[in-house]
């Protein structure tokens, strides 16, 4: 009754008892409700007070300031800032109005994916704002659950290894044509590995997807669309109010650029589809688009956004991987010589099978690619993915629904997995590492439960390996500290064998 009296006084009720039992029962019910509310609030407050702390009460480190766009524009500096502040422990950063947990150690990656990985979600617009959502929101990389599975169902067939392997002879011809254009001199040629390789994967991926519909005219149209894409990404990264629908509605220049891209991209595909169907052309993209037809489960927006992600989002990424591959081969003559010898030995076999060589994981060819992608992963910081359950990550209590980001560059150099020489280019390190260590300690297209989910990985791997084969077979590579070609800033010298 003491509690009821206290609540009565708090609520301003008198102590009159003329209504007897009825008023007492009423006040009792009110008191019970208030007590339940207070208890629930206290329990919730207690739970929240434990969020982002260890069981001993240590609070997780938070990086000050808005780091949303810094993850892309100042990746190295932000990564170093996080390491200086938190060491190897997880930390929080602010991504616009959202908080994201950053992890960088194999055990933390294991904690993140353990038990609930199949139920992970992704934050709206990947926490990148309204314009990003209008641009790439429906793409497969931004989806999860049934929507993700639906898009994958339509896109996976042409990206399976068997489909890609059938394209190897055509890829080789295109790579040889490209080499002839970039290295026309009989003896010595120079390449700027950051520029000259930029559109090679892009071109061969386009060839793979459009097949009979791919020609010089369509390629130039795609290059023009890529320029628009770059402008839109710049708009997104420079937006002052990315989460404001009203601001983005009246931000005319970025809105106009986005609309121009969307209309041209849609019309480009509709024309290709019309021609492919009318002419009976082989065109994997047209087969994918059949999922958009009436009574099917793929929307045109999801189709176009996923095509945007596959083609345009990987242009600069693939160029960086090529730069890492060839600059390190040029700097390591012994690795280059060993790779050339391996290629020659494989090709001298009576039963030589090029797709089989490309698929093998125990070759130096594969190890060079793996080591290059360890050093140059797709993104320094991964896209956010949300925990389904409350869990401990790196000893901290992390609430359900927390967006988690992986510092990929630190993960790929961590001494726990890679020893003290993680910054040294050494393809043979993959000889010594058990596959279990790589599952949560290495990220190129994905890590943990995400390994192998990148749609274009088979095409990209094939193009990287085929290009290595063609270049190393025909040229000896040297580092070019000073370009011998006027007006060029070449960093690699190709000397004909």
UniProtKB/Swiss-Prot annotation:
Q: In which pathway does it act?
A: Secondary metabolite biosynthesis
What follows loss of this gene? Does not affect the production of oxopyrrolidines A and B.
Residues binding heme, per UniProt:
454
An example GO BP is:
mycotoxin biosynthetic process
Annotated TM spans: 26-46
The principal localisation class reads: membrane
Alphabetically list the UniProt keywords. Answer: Iron, Membrane, Metal-binding, Oxidoreductase, Transmembrane, Transmembrane helix
Leader sequence segment? none
Q: How does it sit in the membrane?
A: Single-pass membrane protein
Q: Where is this region: Disordered?
A: 69-90
EC number from the UniProt entry: 1.-.-.-
Q: What GO MF terms are annotated?
A: heme binding; iron ion binding; monooxygenase activity; oxidoreductase activity, acting on paired donors, with incorporation or reduction of molecular oxygen
Decide whether keyword Zinc-finger is in the record.
Answer: no
Q: Which residues form a coiled coil?
A: none
**What is the official name of this protein in its record?**
Cytochrome P450 monooxygenase opdB
Q: Which organism is this entry from?
A: Penicillium oxalicum (strain 114-2 / CGMCC 5302)
> Gene symbol?
opdB
């Amino acid at each position: 009754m003491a509690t009821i009296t206290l609540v009565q006084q708090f609520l301003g009720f008198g102590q009159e008892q003329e209504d007897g039992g009825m008023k007492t029962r009423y006040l009792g019910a009110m008191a019970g409700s208030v007590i339940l509310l207070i208890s629930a609030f206290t329990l919730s407050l207690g739970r929240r007070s434990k969020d982002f702390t260890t069981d001993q009460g240590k609070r997780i480190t938070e990086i000050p300031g808005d780091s949303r766009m810094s993850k892309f524009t100042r990746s190295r500096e932000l990564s170093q800032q996080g390491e200086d502040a938190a060491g190897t422990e997880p930390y929080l950063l602010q991504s616009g109005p959202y908080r994201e947990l950053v992890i960088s150690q194999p055990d933390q990656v294991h904690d993140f994916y353990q038990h609930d990985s199949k139920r992970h979600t992704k934050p709206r617009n990947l926490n990148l704002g309204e314009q990003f959502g209008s641009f790439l929101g429906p793409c497969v990389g931004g989806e999860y659950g049934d929507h993700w599975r639906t898009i994958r169902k339509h896109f996976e067939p042409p990206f399976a290894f068997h489909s890609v392997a059938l394209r190897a002879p055509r890829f080789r011809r295109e790579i040889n044509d490209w080499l002839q254009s970039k290295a026309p001199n009989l003896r010595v040629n120079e390449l700027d590995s950051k520029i000259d390789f930029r559109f090679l994967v892009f071109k061969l991926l386009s060839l793979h997807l459009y097949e009979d519909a791919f020609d010089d005219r369509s390629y130039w149209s795609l290059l023009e669309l890529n320029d628009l894409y770059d402008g839109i990404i710049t708009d997104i990264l420079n937006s002052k109010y990315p989460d404001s629908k009203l601001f983005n509605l009246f931000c005319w220049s970025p809105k106009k650029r986005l609309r121009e891209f969307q209309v041209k991209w849609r019309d480009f595909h509709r024309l290709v589809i019309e021609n492919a169907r009318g002419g009976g052309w082989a065109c994997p993209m047209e087969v994918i688009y059949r999922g958009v037809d009436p009574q099917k489960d793929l929307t045109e927006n999801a189709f176009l956004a996923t095509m945007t992600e596959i083609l345009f989002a990987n242009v600069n990424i693939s160029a960086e991987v090529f730069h890492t591959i060839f600059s390190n081969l040029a700097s390591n003559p012994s690795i280059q010589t060993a790779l050339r010898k391996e290629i020659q030995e494989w090709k001298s076999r009576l039963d030589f099978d090029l797709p089989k060589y490309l698929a093998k994981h125990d070759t130096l060819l594969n190890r060079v690619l793996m080591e290059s992608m360890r050093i140059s992963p797709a993104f320094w910081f991964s896209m956010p993915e949300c925990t389904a359950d409350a869990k401990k990550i790196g000893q901290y209590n992390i609430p359900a629904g927390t967006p988690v980001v992986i510092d990929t560059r630190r993960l790929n150099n961590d001494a726990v997995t890679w020893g003290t020489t993680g910054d040294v280019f050494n393809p043979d390190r993959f000889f010594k590492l058990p596959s279990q260590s790589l599952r949560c300690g290495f990220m190129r297209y994905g890590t943990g439960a995400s390994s192998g989910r990148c749609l274009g990985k088979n095409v990209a791997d094939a193009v990287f390996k085929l290009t290595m084969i063609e270049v190393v077979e025909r040229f000896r590579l040297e580092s070019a500290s000073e370009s011998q070609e006027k007006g060029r800033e070449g960093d690699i010298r190709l000397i004909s064998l």
